[in-house]
Amino acid sequence: MKTFPLFAAASAIILSFVFAGAQTHSGKSSSPQSVNKPHLRYPDDDIGVDSLPARKAAQIATENQLKVFYRFHFTDRLKESGITFKYHAVDDVTRHFRADHYDHGSGIAVADVDGDGLYDIYFVNQAGGNELWKNLGNGRFKNITKEAGVGMPRRISVGAAFADVNNSGHPDLFVTTVRGGNVLFKNDGHGHFTDVTKEAAVGLVAHSSGAFFFDFDKDGLVDLLVCNVGNYTTDEKGPDGEYVGLKDGFYGHLHPDRFEHPVLYKNLGNYHFKDVTAEVGLRPHGWCGDASTADINGDGWPDIYFLNMQGSNSYWENEGGKKFVDKTAEYFPRTPWGAMGIKFFDYADEGRPDLLITDMHSDMSQEPGVDNEKKKSDITWTESYLAGKKSDFIFGNALFHQLADGKFEEVSDKMGVETYWPWGFSVGDLNADGWDDIFVSAGMSFPYRYGINSLLLNNRGEKFLDSEFILGVEPRKNLYTPWFEIDCSRDPDAMQGVNQSVCDGQSGKVIAMSPRSSRSSVIFDLDNGGALDIVTNDFNSEPQVFVSDLAQRKKIRWIKIVLAGTASNREGLGARVVVRAGGLTQTKWMDGKSGYLSQSDLPLYFGLGDAAKIDSIEVSWPSGRKQVLDSGFAENRLLKITEP
């Protein structure tokens, strides 16, 4: 398969998808098919697939570089889980392929919606409705979407976030959409939800994307931040109910009139919110796909970092819950140009929030081949298209390491976190050794080649080492998925756009097969077995449910911590938790945020490595209260800490 840049410096967008007859997923010609069955057409010369055996062998040969435990494995247990969800992409990125932002996919979120101690999964979808799957225990799930009332089948959904909006002890749900109106659902505590969007006044109609809850003014009620990408659609409706994308959608960043700025809603209590964006001076520019929060300057107030899908990101400092001030130049003089995923976490166990950002769009400038996927992108676009000097940007992932003086050093290449076509990522201690690891969901699907998901093991803060083949995340069980069916003999669109290369030399019905790819992910202990598992939301395909066998391979020690605020918000969003054990000090933040459109951070999980005991646990609450526990806890259990 030959691919060309999604964006072009010239005035046209060029895409190509080249096939070679009916093929198997290995690239070899298949035997003749029945005349009554559609031909399956796989991309030809897919270097992403062809290189998998060699990449696996090469990675396994590097095992001796790992100082941490790696002799465990992830297995995709989708079938055993009972989950039958399938992501359905809208027509804009399938049969009538257009280069627009619909190909960015949707998120996934986790919460215990019914209070039974098991974490349930909410899959976000474009066409056909979202789905809520109840955790039955032992790795099994049941679809409860209908009785829960959270399907939203007639909207194009994008992101999701759970939070206890009214401090009732039950996680409520917020979902963003593309021009369908965002939705807030109230949870009755038993996993049944009621749409309270109208009274909450949060039903913005826009091209919304990521969202998260946080208490920006520390009044004990969680507020809501919503990112909006910008106008990339026309008023024409497609067959899936979506608004058809603009032909120059990826030039939208050059049209300020198309911008749709982020919105900050202040929680007034009792499911009522107020738009205070202008009041607090928040006005970041650009196409914001997602954002996250952390107390970057250590003054006790949560700040915000906004991603820009095409251009410079921005950091806004919280001044006492009254105003936000743009401090980007002071802290982050260069940022990724095509940012997609974001997460604050302490990768070096130094007690300070470091920042990882994935950059997918820079990888669309040109295809480097698999040997160069760990390098920054060689940008071919003009500076007029970039809307800035090349020297102003980082063209790839960025890992900002916070130093003792509060400044940040960009160390992505030094730390080995560059990946290819990355979307969202999730962070968690996958081998329970006290060092947070990274799972990166990636790939581009039709009409591009196969791209791998990445799993980066934290080598004790010294470097992240590629481990997706070592640990069984790659290669996938199924490398391709059906994308769309077309009748090459009768369909009037058969020789239009990418369909022309699909139907070239063919007659009758043809199914175009696409490389599989992931857009978002969550990390949590889905079976309460003590080890962290991974669930993905794959684009136009089924999810992957990666179950870890770590607990069966070695004796592991861990503690999970859930917070109960009193003066602070009920879930303790914004709290800082420090666990000291075995000479290692781990710091995590209750931010309720995963890497892209998603959420997987409740409860906090601390791997304890070989520590014989936990020495102390310290909680810094959003209210300003500090709490130190030096007894009353044990390993391998869930600990609930209530604010004094």
Model-predicted segments: where are they?
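Bacterial N-terminal signal peptides
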Residues: 8-17
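Hydrophobic beta-strand segments that make up the repeating blades of beta-propeller
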Residues: 74, 118-125, 170-177, 224-228, ...
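Structural signal for beta-propeller blades
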Residues: 129-132, 181-184, 233, 262-264, ...
